[in-house]
Amino acid sequence: MKYGIVLFPSKKLQDIANSYRKRYDPNYALIPPHLTLRTPFEVSEDEISGVVRHLRELSKELKPVTLKITKFSSFAPVNNVIYMKAEPTEELMQLHEKMYSGVLEDKPEYAFVPHVTVAQKLSDDEHSDVLGTLKMRDASHEEVIDRFHLLYQLDNGSWTVYETFILGA
């Protein structure tokens, strides 16, 4: 089964992200706005209990993280994804690194750029127009997130929470 590990921001930030995602993100209905801590990975049913145990231990060691959204940005020209950029704080970077340790040990596929996606799979022209508009808006937002979530993917492609882990508990 395919799993992923994410932070879900507050409803306030999710509402802001969704106001764009409804129109510009074809994955809008598959998963709420989130910050990916670990890209999707395959784990068998036999192995998932070990993963959950490992994540429980990690959650006790780690503290809640401050999420500071600073601006709208893009991964162009690599791809036409537009996102709300999160400041790569030490605590957020550490949380990401821990998601690739222990039974989950692996090398991340990409450098970690903490973000919340608001638009993807846009044409070049649409990407340019949307990004130009969003860059003029104030994206400043700060909040503390005290939990992360292990998600799994359903047959229809949507993601749902398998387990939630409280940071520092």
From Swiss-Prot:
**Which parts of the sequence form the motif HXTX 2?**
115-118
Query: What Pfam families does the database record attribute to this sequence?
Result: 2_5_RNA_ligase2
Does Translocase appear among the keywords?
A: no
Q: Mind telling me which residue stretches traverse the membrane in this protein?
A: none
Query: Where do the catalytic residues lie?
Result: H34, H115
Annotated keywords: Hydrolase
Superkingdom of origin: Bacteria
The EC category is hydrolase
- Placement of sequence motif HXTX 1: 34-37
InterPro entries recorded: 2H_phosphoesterase_YjcG-like, Cyclic_Pdiesterase, YjcG
| Documented EC number(s) | 3.1.-.-
Q: Under the GO molecular function aspect, what terms does this record hold? A: hydrolase activity, acting on ester bonds
Has the keyword Disulfide bond been applied to this entry? Answer: no
Write down the PANTHER family for this protein, in alphabetical order: PHOSPHOESTERASE SAOUHSC_00951-RELATED, PHOSPHOESTERASE YJCG-RELATED
**Which protein family is named in the record?**
Belongs to the 2H phosphoesterase superfamily. YjcG family.
Identification of the protein by name: Putative phosphoesterase BLi01284/BL02661
Organism of derivation: Bacillus licheniformis (strain ATCC 14580 / DSM 13 / JCM 2505 / CCUG 7422 / NBRC 12200 / NCIMB 9375 / NCTC 10341 / NRRL NRS-1264 / Gibson 46)
Supply the source organism's classification: Bacteria, Bacillati, Bacillota, Bacilli, Bacillales
